[in-house]
Amino acid sequence: MLPFAPVEDPWDQEDMEVFGSTSSSEPQVVFTMKNAATVMREHERKEVNDLKMVDEPMEEGEPVSCRREELVKEVPITQHVKEGYEKADPAQFDLLKVLGQGSFGKVFLVRKKTGPDAGQLYAMKVLRKASLKVRDRVRTKMERDILVEVNHPFIVKLHYAFQTEGKLYLILDFLRGGDVFTRLSKEVLFTEEDVKFYLAELALALDHLHRLGIVYRDLKPENILLDEIGHIKLTDFGLSKESVDQEKKAYSFCGTVEYMAPEVVNRRAHSQSADWWSYGVLMFEMLTGTLPFQGKDRNETMNMILKAKLGMPQFLSAEAQSLLRMLFKRNPANRLGSEGVEEVKRHAFFASIDWNKLYKREVQPPFRPASGKPDDTFCFDPEFTAKTPKDSPGLPASANAHQLFKGFSFVATSIAEEYKITPVTSSNVLPIVQINGNAAQFSEAYELKEDIGIGSYSVCKRCIHSASNVEFAVKIIDKNKRDPSEEIEILMRYGQHPNIISLKEVFDDGKYVYLVTDLMKGGELLDRILKKKCFSEQEASNVLYVITKTVECLHSQGVVHRDLKPSNILYMDESAHPDSIKICDFGFAKQLRGENGLLLTPCYTANFVAPEVLTQQGYDAACDIWSLGVLLYTMLAGYTPFSNGPNDTPEEILLRIGNGRFSLSGGIWDNISRGAKDLLSHMLHMDPHQRYTAEQVLKHPWITQREQLPRHQPNSDEPPQEAVAAPYSVLARNPNRHHPILEPVTASRLAQRRNMKKRTSTGL
């Protein structure tokens, strides 16, 4: 048996200044040990306490007795069925969609048809017995046993377990938010606040398992699910080990190799401490977008885990760096968490966490997954959800296999009490969003009418719903020119806000995406400005209040619009009341990403672009405030602050913005209050750090005391139409020069790496 891996920390003496860039050196790997293939061959010949150590699943005919740990797990257990309730069977569930598929079976979205929980949605994990080797069968039964025993707010709940002659069924919580891996693949990396929240909830889940004597052993983003609110739930217990404490340690070689602790790679005895190493790997990946130990193949990855020196990313906070160093201890006895979760909770990285509120799910998650109807699967891989859900007959397994799963059936004891609720039916499902399959379905459901607007990547048309004869608007986006996924997610997540355009349906034919929304019959704010020439101060303040209040809501959720302008702000009806305003066109909107919250991709409409975008210094929510400042200026003056007329070139407009030169004196400005000018000067401040936030704008006296503002329109000698329309006509003639195509996050090298190598360890 090989000795323990070296106990020194895996960090370089000199930290890396920039981590993960092409110019930085790769983590230094020291290959002074036997290669991993030799290690594995040696261990295949070794026995520890008479337990044969094999990495591959055993064949059907191999004696089960060679694995004592598996033999123990074949002891039949008492059937868990509440008195008076019948056992579940496949006929009691309607198959709705395929959520995932592996070599052993599928995961379906299902709806219960009978019983006290009729109408409830579940995830149904179906495994074919004939496809499972002996070790996999043991793992499946182990997963069922653990889920029966575990009851925790951050661990997926098992509601039913049953079997047929050829298949095994686990009926679990359906988590609409998908998994953390999917979110990480889309966003590449998370902010430290996001990571802190996920790690804190995960720490409580791991502690609960450890207190029950369970080592999880397969911690990775794919096994952490998000509910519709954004809280986590740990799932997939096929590799977990029951009844393991400091005196009774596990020896199995299992898990996803990139997340394995050194003692697991070395096939030495391991306990709960191994989970805290994997916890550190997960933290590192979420913060940096890359794995700390990943070679060109499995063997090199194992070598790196045992020997590699790794640079500490310097953009991480001191607290985050400290936690990583304490988790990445190659000696498990020295690893943070080896003495229990309390030492993890006491670490400075979690200083802002209220653990009691967290356990009660009273802490607001930093990210709310896109979700519409209860059975919406937008957060799941369309490769699976597009398939027709079909539970094919399973081949009968051997008699020995049936004996192995004796006592597999289970019904949650709280099933009647838990589901004294209104069943989910078509009448009470919120008709917000439905992801539909193709354009044929759109043409069957809607009749296209005239154009409403034409953009660089899309066209907006009026349409009529054939069944109800109700008018809607549809935005048709060319997927070859723009990735609409982020716009769809943001609209799905925040479309319930009264001042954000609501998304009704989404159709995708592969080339075009069709976004069906409300038809805004009141027209654009731009049209109203042109019609009135300028607003009274009271009307301008009322309009700015509604828009800024909506923007504040978006900013609090880490969303920036990045294209706020009068043509993207519409009235719901012809009353033109400020409360009927809705912000539309989220084509340039983004969720803030990165530890510093900055965005580096410039996209803008001239006149409404902040100066720091032009210099590509990165920008955050302050750019939206700049755009709102330009909007306020335009409402009060009837023209934009940086355009002199229709003959202005884009270069001239952008140069004036870069210089930050605008006038608040002379002409119409002699009739504008000092309060309005003061607010404008703060909203159009050149320095984004000194520019007002949305919250500060809302607290300004010109907003809070708007009922006292003048209601009359000031006289204006300016020709407003040409001045206001100039930037838009210029951009219409030169769309590509000032609206660069933004490549989706999936085009990044990190996202491509994830797409090429989808890590799996248990098949499902």
Swiss-Prot record:
Residues at the catalytic site: 218, 563
Post-translational modifications: Phosphorylated at Ser-252, Ser-392, and Ser-409 in serum-starved cells.
Cellular location(s): Cytoplasm, Cytosol; Nucleus
Domain AGC-kinase C-terminal: 351-420
Enzyme class at the top of the EC tree: transferase
GO CC annotations on file: cytosol; nucleus; synapse
EC number: 2.7.11.1
Residues found modified as Phosphoserine: 252, 392, 409
Gene Ontology molecular function: ATP binding; magnesium ion binding; protein serine kinase activity; protein serine/threonine kinase activity
Keywords: ATP-binding, Cytoplasm, Kinase, Magnesium, Metal-binding, Nucleotide-binding, Nucleus, Phosphoprotein, Repeat, Serine/threonine-protein kinase, Transferase
Entry similarity comment: Belongs to the protein kinase superfamily. AGC Ser/Thr protein kinase family. S6 kinase subfamily.
Name under which the protein is recorded: Ribosomal protein S6 kinase alpha-6
Record Pfam families: Pkinase, Pkinase_C
Span of domain Protein kinase: 93-350, 446-706
Disulfide topology: none
Subunit composition and interactions: Forms a complex with MAPK3/ERK1 but not with MAPK9 or MAPK14 in serum-starved cells.
Cofactors named for this entry: Mg(2+)
Chain positions with Phosphothreonine modification: 601
Function field: Constitutively active serine/threonine-protein kinase that exhibits growth-factor-independent kinase activity and that may participate in p53/TP53-dependent cell growth arrest signaling and play an inhibitory role during embryogenesis.
